[in-house]
Amino acid sequence: CGMIEPDKGQVFLNEQDVTQWPMYRRAREGGMGYLPQQTSVFAKLSTEQNLLAMMELLGMNRRQRKLRCEELLEQFRITHIRRSKAGKLSGGEKRRLEIARCLVSNPEIIMLDEPFAGIDPVTVQSIQGIIGDLRDRGISILITDHAAREILQITDRTYVISEGQVLCSGTAEEIVRHDEVREKYLGDIDSFDQSAAPAPHFSLTQQGGTTSAGSGLRRRRTDLDLS
């Protein structure tokens, strides 16, 4: 996402070398969104102000900010907490706000770091639904997480990384059949039925056409890195 300079290799997005681009440039020009594991809301601002602040940074005018803010509040079902201080929200409410704020710039790719950390099981299902809806809109999603059981339900392809090396990659079923992955990460999971994944709690409105992403990520793919 641009926070750490790679030791080697290059990062391409839509055939553009973005290896040396800082995070803000990747977001504004490259269409890349990033959600860190740590809570990133502006605690002293309201839910609504958190969204508006990002829109101002992007240079949106007042009318654009109002329309986009109302749209995101409704899409993520956080209208009822629009004036609540972000620091007082529950873990799940903060996570929905963070994802909504990440979408302000209409990214083509979203990178999620441990999106299920610190939230209750019901909210986990809600976030799974949100991720599924984003994928269906044509947004590529790259997830780094240790919550294998939750993540394997929603990823199209998974990469398991151990000691800096790719241990294996494939579909959920291919991952759970890998002996070394089972031993190190999955324990007694015998199979994995993605059809059992929770249905989305709500749908996100499609804005314009679907987008495509480069750097090896297919359109509408959700990837997982179990490091």
Regions found by a protein language model. Name each.
Residues 1:
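Helix-to-loop junction immediately C-terminal to a conserved catalytic motif
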Residues 5, 17-33, 38, 62-66, ...:
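ABC ATPase NBD coupling module
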Residues 16, 52, 63-81, 128-132:
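Conserved ABC ATPase "signature" region
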Residues 45-52:
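Short coil-to-helix segment of the ABC ATPase nucleotide-binding domain corresponding to the Q-loop/switch region
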Residues 85-89, 93:
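Conserved ABC ATPase signature
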Residues 106:
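Conserved catalytic motifs of ABC-family nucleotide-binding domains
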Residues 110-114:
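Catalytic Walker B motif of ABC-type/P-loop ATPase nucleotide-binding domains
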